[in-house]
């Protein structure tokens, strides 16, 4: 892991298209501004972990589970 020290307003550049700027420091919190391509997803780690967990649960559904859901909803997708 690369560890950098930055002051208020200073920037870290990653590759050609990502810039991370220190925009505010208050107590033990730092606010970062991130410029990146629109197609790049940026998450706080706790949100990323939650999304990954939900994706794993969704991927673990079997075909039988999906068929039951479709049957419960009916052919038109309504209860």
UniProtKB/Swiss-Prot annotation:
Its main location: cytoplasm. Gene3D superfamilies: Translational regulator CsrA. The keyword Lyase does not apply. It comes from the Bacteria. The keyword Lipid metabolism does not apply. It is found in: Cytoplasm. Homodimer; the beta-strands of each monomer intercalate to form a hydrophobic core, while the alpha-helices form wings that extend away from the core. This is Translational regulator CsrA. It comes from Geobacter sulfurreducens (strain ATCC 51573 / DSM 12127 / PCA).
């Amino acid at each position: 892991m690369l560890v950098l020290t930055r002051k208020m307003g200073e920037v870290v550049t990653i590759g050609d298209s990502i810039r991370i700027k220190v925009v505010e420091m208050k107590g033990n919190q730092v606010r970062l501004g991130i410029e990146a391509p629109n197609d790049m997803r940026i998450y706080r780690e706790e949100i990323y972990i939650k999304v990954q967990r939900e994706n794993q649960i969704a991927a673990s559904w079997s075909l039988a589970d999906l068929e039951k859901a479709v049957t419960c909803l009916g052919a038109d997708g309504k209860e």
